[in-house]
């Protein structure tokens, strides 16, 4: 067992970079929040990925949150390389609110990021973006929480993905000292 697999399942995202004819979409699991104030997120991308070069060139990217309905597109985005894969995907690229990089209409949410830092760690570059705007489907979020009926995707390994169950677990009451 490879040690990194011990950290799965991880949420799956689509990273959009570039614009116009240079737009690309890739699947990524290695995405996380790195700061609340200012709100920043990070994504690890290998230098051989086409998206890596577009983020370096345009200094911005969009993190799109796919649902189970988008699994085919997630798979294409994660297994094909270069912009020609967009012809196979059934997504609609729409203008973002604050960036030149487009967002994905079918996504549960789109988080628009302006690149503020990048560092190489081993075989990946860690791109940190400050969130400058966002959009989301109203049916996918309620009361400031994800609506699990929207079927957010998580990647377990290889071709296996799961969604989150509707049952919410809460810890038993813990009394503070």
Where are the regions a protein language model picked out?
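Basic, polyanion-binding surface patches
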Residues: 1-177
